[in-house]
Amino acid sequence: MYIERQLEKKFIAINEEYACVLLTGPRQVGKSTMLRHLMEGTARAEVSLDDLEERRLAKTDPAMFLKLHPAPVLIDEVQYAPELFSYIKIAVDNGAAPGSYWLTGSQAYRLMELAQESLAGRTAILHMSALSQSELCGVVDVSPFSLELDELQKRKAVLSPATPNEIYQRIWGGALPGHRSGKYKDRDVFYSSYIQTYIDRDVTTDIPGVDKVMFADFIRAAACRSGQMLNLHDIAGDVGVSDDTAKRWMKELEKSGIVFFLHPYSNNLLKRTIKTPKMYFFDTGLVCYLTRYSSPEILMNGAINGAILENYVVSEIIKTYSNSAQDCLLHYYRDKNSNEIDLIMESDGQLHPIEIKKSINPPTQITGAFKLLDKASVPRGTGAIICLREALSAIDSGTYIVPAWMI
């Protein structure tokens, strides 16, 4: 079953303007599936550089490769043959029509570097995340998450309400289309294959000679700390590698789109803030698999129930922006007095503080730290508690209580 993606309309619009469109995103988020859906009934051909013979030709004779695969064409996993970029540039400079080249790849940082070096101003770059909860609800016409009351009311009208148990079912089930579409029903087999493929194809290419078993242990150790401030020394100790190795491996996870970091908010007027970033996984289903939670019910009562909810909320907010091809400025706040704000959204010249709580009736005093942002040079805007309550409500005119299903 194909799940409609919010990014489809943006991709189609961009495709009418640019000869080359690059779609990045982690493995298995549905990049190729969406593009195959969009090219149904057209003359566009597809070639994947996962095919070793095609990859060899693309690397050794890119001109011949492009002759054998003329535009319009979809080139999948283009990061395996960076030699193609300069030849695509020539084709674009020679007047290639809009939509001639669709490129996909699972190493966003490297691909963006290559595109900026060889195709600056000639290619549009879009990023695809795993499925958002709105996409899983069949809703693709929705704006990025905002704490404007009108926008919250719009989300309330189109999204599907969820009980606390249903929220944890969403968290446990994850957001990768291969499993959520029903194509691969056995969740454990799916995620086991996902990790194995990622290590075999990407990690061994980027880190020659890597110990595959130790790297798998490293991912698991990181998953146990998702939603926490990054402590590479502790992770390294759990796995039995050096701090330098742990740092290099964590960069690999970030580069591959497995994890992301939330950096602390600070400015010259907030001098006592902690500098350590917090680490999150883009897919909570992967975290639950790696930490061996066998059901949503056990997860909901488990040791990571609060951290995994926070991970879910932060990643879902990011998806609402990436699905609209918009940037999202997110931070967290923690100072040396242990005052903390889970999330700060910076938008329209304001700071919007957010607390994320595994509670139906969160205590209102947890918003007390919000006032610390009044010292910042950027004005404080509307704040919120995002929690398991099923209905939208408010503490006062400046602080909403937002259900997690409404993201």
Describe each model-derived feature in a short phrase:
Residues 44-72:
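Short glycine-rich substrate-engagement loop in P-loop NTPases that contacts/grips substrate
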Residues 85-103, 107-109, 116-117:
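Conserved catalytic/switch belt of AAA+ P-loop NTPases
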Residues 1-9, 13-28, 32-45, 49, ...:
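A cross-kingdom feature that marks ATP-driven nucleic-acid transaction machinery
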Residues 69-84:
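Conserved P-loop NTPase "ATPase switch" module shared by AAA+ and STAND
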Residues 124-135:
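Conserved AAA+ ATPase "SRH/arginine-finger" region at the nucleotide-binding site
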Residues 53-55, 80-82, 110-111:
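Catalytic P-loop NTPase motifs of RecA-like helicase/translocase cores
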Residues 109-125, 139-142:
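Short regulatory helix/loop adjacent to the ATP-binding pocket of P-loop NTPases
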Residues 133-134, 138-316:
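Interdomain hinge/linker elements that couple catalytic modules in large macromolecular machines
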